[in-house]
């Protein structure tokens, strides 16, 4: 007899193989089979399969084996054989699914566009998607506790970035650029020297973001790029001033600059290479400083000690360098697809608080270049730009940086960037006060008078950076009432946020002081504040799919005969879901912390993540980051349970109850586990579609949940997506003030990141003061992070820039929609070509109502509009 194997090969039937599989099954249940019985079993199998057409199928042989065991009443052995058979079938089917998925990724035949920043059709995109598919299966089948894997598969709790779960990568990070600029950075191939000009500063910003993005799966941020740039703008000013001074010497006029620039030589003793022109300048720098009596500290904009002619020449060259450097930075961050071989790094920059002329010029250059556009005037997608709003600095006329705020508004109206972060957010203020109180308690606890005096004798700059100063007259430590730049509110673009660090303790601060006293300088691997943003990040997020729990609760309550208790059933289920989410995050956190330093050597060698102590492993740094418990579908959940969303007072009441539970549980876990659990309002780029699809498959079309009623036919049609986090649904016809009023009641519960945005029409550029009014109103309402969406379309055929509706032709040249870039905000970041969005995001983008349609005072004028909300804004701002 012949047998057809599963791979298609044909081979002779072998009785020995029947004996082997029966013995394996009997061994599994520890029931021996003697030789006589084994002979009978094999004989039965042979007689049964010999009647079949050759070649015999494997499944038929296995059926015969089961029949033989049942015939001789070997039920336990038959069950063991059957279970093993089912297990092997599942493995084979899983392998088939994986191979099928790999084929689809390789051929780009089933493009999902799960990430609008990735081209899944490209070589790099297909390669990346194939690897990601394998790693996701690895995570779900072998890495994650099967309880959590089941919750993920059944649409209860979503495990983000499963491919990175398998690898043990963390999410995102605010890079400590101040340290990198001062010390330089080490890469695998080269050491990059410290910056000594604004042009090298912006180059290192771009390079640093790209290098760090390869160590993680989320975004990278600069928390105060305008302040960070100041020292290097001053270096540039000094360099240009020196050159201007040298040009006045007769010697300069007789130089052969080309020959000197090309004349390099190697130093015999050290092997270091030098350049004759650079040597000539360096040799005369000492002479210059001696003759002029100047030092580095004298080179700042506005110093009247400097020679006016030389100063103006140097200032002109410095301003040009700033503008060109910023332009180059934007080009680099929009063009160098260094992430996974086919993506741009998800990068963000925060600015707006620096009041020095140098910092103001840098901010001005960012905004002017953003308005102008990159390349042939295209909107800059990266970095995500965040303007930091703070009373007394930039929120009203007379404030030092109010003019920059006005320019930011002009930029937002044209390019959507910058977004706006509220540096007076009530949650941030409470966290700052708590951090300062912790430090004060630690300082007051110092028992040794000798150590106390050593701390008191630290340089003012160090004390200031640590948030205190020693009052010599009163002989006491006093705490600063202002934040350091690395403490101020900033965000990592999409919305992620770092709040109060539970692991920045009094003991930690005292140890920091001890190390500082010993060395006379601040240790670079330590954190300096409990609310520090630099060197911290979101370690890992998970998201609870609220509509799933809501529908299950409603069904259970109805089944139990108590439909009026649906909300109570839901709240109980949600509490358990949050508990499960916490357990899963701890499992993932422990796996991340189990990775070696070699897995992200660039990050650890350069102290990118603060708090790293080699003897304690990478957990010493990871524990200062955030573990985020997220959510999706608040609006749909309220519809399921109450028949309304959060715009209705009943809906808002339940929404607050839900968020309070999130907040209470996260605070409880934070204290219990000494990990920074936080409430996260999930961006949900692909999840908005995948969670919806699974829900729809199970529960079908439900009005205002998975479907909307067609206004013409009255038929229910699929919506295509779930609403992100706690947002008011995009299809609601409300004014921007109503949307802000609604969401402002919920954002205060979030400690790990949130965003509020409004949709503005294509006349935003003609309503700048009205747009400013909206931003200030959001701030007055204690909105954390705010953005405006304006319709931006660019024709790649003729360069036309203006509002072009989806699926329309260019009004200037008639080019088809495929030649038109439609920009839209997807998760906090911008994306271009809505065709590259996943199906759910395409539906959501098209559903967005322009909120200004419902604001009667939105007019084509730059005059301040009369609005009942405006007085409130003015009073608050």
Model-inferred region functions:
Residues 811, 816-873:
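Long insertion/accessory domains within large nucleic-acid-processing enzymes
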């Amino acid at each position: 007899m012949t047998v057809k194997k599963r791979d298609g090969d044909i081979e002779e039937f072998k009785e020995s193989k029947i004996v082997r599989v029966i013995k394996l099954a009997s061994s599994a249940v520890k029931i021996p089979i003697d030789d006589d019985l084994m002979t009978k079993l094999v004989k039965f199998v042979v007689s049964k399969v010999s009647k079949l057409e050759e070649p015999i199928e494997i499944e038929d042989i296995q059926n015969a084996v089961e029949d033989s065991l049942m015939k001789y009443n070997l039920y336990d052995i038959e069950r063991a054989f059957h279970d093993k058979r089912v297990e092997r079938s599942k493995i084979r089917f899983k392998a088939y699914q994986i191979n099928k998925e790999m084929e689809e990724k390789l051929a780009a035949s089933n493009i999902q566009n799960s990430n609008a920043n990735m081209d899944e059709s490209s070589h790099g995109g297909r390669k990346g998607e194939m690897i990601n598919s394998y790693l996701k299966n690895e995570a779900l089948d072998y890495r994650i506790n099967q309880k959590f894997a089941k919750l993920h598969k059944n649409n209860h709790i979503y495990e983000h970035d499963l491919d990175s779960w398998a690898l043990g990568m963390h999410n995102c990070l605010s890079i400590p650029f101040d340290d990198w600029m001062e010390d330089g950075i080490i890469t695998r191939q080269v050491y990059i020297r410290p910056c000594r000009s604004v042009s090298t500063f912006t180059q290192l910003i771009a390079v640093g973001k790209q290098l760090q993005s390869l160590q993680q799966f989320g975004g990278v941020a600069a928390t105060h790029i305008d302040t960070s740039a100041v020292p290097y703008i001053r270096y540039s000013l000094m360099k240009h001033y020196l050159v201007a001074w040298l040009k006045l010497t007769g010697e300069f006029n007789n130089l052969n600059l080309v020959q000197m620039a090309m004349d390099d030589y190697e130093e015999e003793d050290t092997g270091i290479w030098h350049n004759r022109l650079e040597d000539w300048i360096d040799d005369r720098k000492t002479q210059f400083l001696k003759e002029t009596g100047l030092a580095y500290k004298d080179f700042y904009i506005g110093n009247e000690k400097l020679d006016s002619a030389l100063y103006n020449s140097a200032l002109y060259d410095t301003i040009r360098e700033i503008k060109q450097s910023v332009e180059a930075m934007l080009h680099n961050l929009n063009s160098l697809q260094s992430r996974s071989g086919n993506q741009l790094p998800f990068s963000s920059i925060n600015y707006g608080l620096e009041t020095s002329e140098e910092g103001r010029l840098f901010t001005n250059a960012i905004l002017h270049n953003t308005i102008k556009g990159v390349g042939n005037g295209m909107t800059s997608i990266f970095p995500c730009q965040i303007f930091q709003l703070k009373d007394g600095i930039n929120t009203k006329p007379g404030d030092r940086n109010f003019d920059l705020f006005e320019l930011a508004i002009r930029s937002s109206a044209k390019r959507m960037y910058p977004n706006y972060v509220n540096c007076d957010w009530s949650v941030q203020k409470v966290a700052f006060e708590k951090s300062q109180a912790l430090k004060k308690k630690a300082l007051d606890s110092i028992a040794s008078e000798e150590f106390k005096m050593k701390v008191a004798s630290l340089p003012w700059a160090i004390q200031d950076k640590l948030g205190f100063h020693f009052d010599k007259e009163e002989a006491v430590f006093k705490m600063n009432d202002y934040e350091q730049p690395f403490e101020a509110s900033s965000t990592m673009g999409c919305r992620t946020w770092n709040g109060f660090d539970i692991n920045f303790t009094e003991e930690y601060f005292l140890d920091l002081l001890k190390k500082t006293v010993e060395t006379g300088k601040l240790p670079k691997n330590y954190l300096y504040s409990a609310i520090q943003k630099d060197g911290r990040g979101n370690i890992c997020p998970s998201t609870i799919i609220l509509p799933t729990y809501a529908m299950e609760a409603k069904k259970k309550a109805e089944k139990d005969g108590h439909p009026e208790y649906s909300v109570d059933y839901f709240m109980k289920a949600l509490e358990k879901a949050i508990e499960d989410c916490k357990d899963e995050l701890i499992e993932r956190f422990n796996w991340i912390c189990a990775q070696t330093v070699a897995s992200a050597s660039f990050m650890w060698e350069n102290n990118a993540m603060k708090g790293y102590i080699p003897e304690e492993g990478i957990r010493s740094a990871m524990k200062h980051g955030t573990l985020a418990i997220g959510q999706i579908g608040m609006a749909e959940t309220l519809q399921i349970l109450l028949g309304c969303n959060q715009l209705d007072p009943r809906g808002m009441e339940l929404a607050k109850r839900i968020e309070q539970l999130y907040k209470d549980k996260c605070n409880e876990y934070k204290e219990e586990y000494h990990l920074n659990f936080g409430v996260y309002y999930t961006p949900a780029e692909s999840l908005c579609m995948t969670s919806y699809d699974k829900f729809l498959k199970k529960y079908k079309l439900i009005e205002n949940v998975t479907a909307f009623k067609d206004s013409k036919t009255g038929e229910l049609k699929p919506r295509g997506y779930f609403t992100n986090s706690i947002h008011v649904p995009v299809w609601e016809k409300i004014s921007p003030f109503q949307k802000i009023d609604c969401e402002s009641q919920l954002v205060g519960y979030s400690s790990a990141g949130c965003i509020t945005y409004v949709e503005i029409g294509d006349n935003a550029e003609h309503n700048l003061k009205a747009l400013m009014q909206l931003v200030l109103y959001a701030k007055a309402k204690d909105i954390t992070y705010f953005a405006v969406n304006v319709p931006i379309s660019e024709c790649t055929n003729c360069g036309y820039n203006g509002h072009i509706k989806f699926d329309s032709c260019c009004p200037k040249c008639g080019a088809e929609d495929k030649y038109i870039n439609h920009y839209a905000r997807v998760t906090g970041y911008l994306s271009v070509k809505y065709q590259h969005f996943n199906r759910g995001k395409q539906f959501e983008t098209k559903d967005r109502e322009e909120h200004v349609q419902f604001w009667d005072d939105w007019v084509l004028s730059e005059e301040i509009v009369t609005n009942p909300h405006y007085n409130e804004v003015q009073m608050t701002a």
